[in-house]
Amino acid sequence: MINYSKPRGTIDLYNKEMNDFKLLENFLLSTTKRYGFQQIKTPVFEFAELFMKSAGESSDLVSKEMYLFKDKSDRWLALRPEGTAGVIRAVVENKLLLNHPLPLKLMYFEPCFRYERPQAGRQRQFHQFGVEVLGTKNIYYDFELIALADTILKKLMISNYILEINYISSPHNRSLWVKSLQEYFHLHRTELTPLSQERITTNPLRILDDKLESQKLVVKQAPKISHFLSNEEKEEFNLIKKMLDDYNIKYYVNEGLVRGLDYYSGLVFEFISTSPKLLGQSTIIGGGRYGELIKQTGGPNYEGIGFGIGIERLLIALSETNKNILNTDDDKYLIAFFDKELENEAIKLTQILRINNQLNVDIILSSTKADKIFKLAQRLNVKKLIILAKKEWSDKKIILKDLLNFKQDLLSLDEIKGIR
C-alpha cells in the first residue's frame, strides 16, 4: 500500500492554524480596504517570460527558484513566484489604468511558489498579501504604503521589527552605479564566492542582496547608490524621510538594501523581524517603487509602488506576541443533548441559531455524557455550550454554559433564541 505524504516545502492547515490563517487574511483585506484598495485575483500560473522580464533573468527568483513547465502546446509557463508581475499584467491587459480614476489601488492575497530550501518562514508554497498603487509619481504614496505596513504590524501588536529603507536610482544613474560596482568587485573578485564572481558581469546588485556575501566587509565597502543620485532624487528621498519623521515612524537607511527583483527604481523598504524564530528569513514585509515595469509589460508609461507580506512569516512573528489578537470571531456555540428524544429539538435549535441569528453553531449528533461533551467542546475551542437535558427541558429551560468564564445559566427557549 502506498503511503502518500505532502511534497517537501508545503504544509497542511487545519484547526487553529487554519482559523488563524483565515482571520489574518480577513484582517489584512479589511484594513487595506479602508485605505481605498480593491481586491484583484490573477491566475496561479502565467507565461514564464512575464517573470523573467520583470524580475530579471539573473535574479535568484528566475535562475533558481521558479517552477517552470511546458503545456501541451509546448509553451513555457511558471507557477506564480510573486504577486506584482501578474497584477501588472492583468492591469495592462484589461486597460484598467485607462478606464479608472488614478491612482489605481489594488490588493491581492494569493499562493506563490518558489523552489527554495525549506525552513522556518520559508516554504515552497507560501502565501503573499500585497498592495499596489499604480499611475502616480506622487511620493505621498511612498509614505502611505510604509505607514500602512507599519499600522498593520502595530495593530497586530508586533513590535519586534525594524524598518530599513533605501533609494534606488533611475535606470541611467543606476547603470553608472552598476558599472562602478563591476569595476570595484573585479578588483576584489578573489574575496567573493564563485557565484558572486559570475554575478559581477551579469548583475552585481545580486551580490549586495546575497545574505551571506552582504555580511563581508568587502561588500559593505562597495560603492553606494547615494553617490549616483541626482539632486532631484536626493530631494525626493529626503522628503520621504521627513514624512516618516513627522509621523514618528522609525527607520534606518541601509544603502545595501536593493531587494531581490530588478524592477525597483526609487524607494525600497523592508520590515525586518528580530524574532529568533525567523533568523535568516526575517523580512516580513518588503516593497518599493517601480518606474519601468508597467511600460515593460506593454502598458502606458506610468509608475507604481507596492509591497508584499509573507503570510507564513507574519504568523510566526505574530505567535511571539502571546496575545490572541486575531481571535475576533463571534463566539462559537456547541449544542448537545443528553437524551435521544431531544435530538430533533436540538437540530431545530441549531438551524434557528445559524439562520436567524447568524451564529457560529455546531451540534453533537448523539446523546452522550457530560464529561465527553466538555472534552469535545475543549478540543473544538468552543466558548459557549448549549445543553438540552430531559429534566430542564420539561420545565422549558435550556442550559447555557460559558466555558471561558466558568458560568452556567438556565434560560428559556425564547431567551436562547434571542442570543445575538
UniProtKB/Swiss-Prot annotation:
<dbReference type="Pfam" id="PF13393">
    <property type="entry name" value="tRNA-synt_His"/>
</dbReference>
<keyword id="KW-0963">Cytoplasm</keyword>
<comment type="subunit">
    <text>Homodimer.</text>
</comment>
<dbReference type="InterPro" id="IPR045864">
    <property type="entry name" value="aa-tRNA-synth_II/BPL/LPL"/>
</dbReference>
<keyword id="KW-0648">Protein biosynthesis</keyword>
<dbReference type="GO" id="GO:0006427">
    <property type="term" value="P:histidyl-tRNA aminoacylation"/>
</dbReference>
<dbReference type="InterPro" id="IPR041715">
    <property type="entry name" value="HisRS-like_core"/>
</dbReference>
<keyword id="KW-0436">Ligase</keyword>
<keyword id="KW-0547">Nucleotide-binding</keyword>
<dbReference type="GO" id="GO:0005524">
    <property type="term" value="F:ATP binding"/>
</dbReference>
<dbReference type="InterPro" id="IPR004516">
    <property type="entry name" value="HisRS/HisZ"/>
</dbReference>
<dbReference type="GO" id="GO:0005737">
    <property type="term" value="C:cytoplasm"/>
</dbReference>
<dbReference type="InterPro" id="IPR015807">
    <property type="entry name" value="His-tRNA-ligase"/>
</dbReference>
<comment type="similarity">
    <text>Belongs to the class-II aminoacyl-tRNA synthetase family.</text>
</comment>
<protein>
    <recommendedName>
        <fullName>Histidine--tRNA ligase</fullName>
        <ecNumber>6.1.1.21</ecNumber>
    </recommendedName>
</protein>
<dbReference type="GO" id="GO:0004821">
    <property type="term" value="F:histidine-tRNA ligase activity"/>
</dbReference>
<keyword id="KW-0030">Aminoacyl-tRNA synthetase</keyword>
<keyword id="KW-0067">ATP-binding</keyword>
<dbReference type="InterPro" id="IPR006195">
    <property type="entry name" value="aa-tRNA-synth_II"/>
</dbReference>
<dbReference type="InterPro" id="IPR036621">
    <property type="entry name" value="Anticodon-bd_dom_sf"/>
</dbReference>
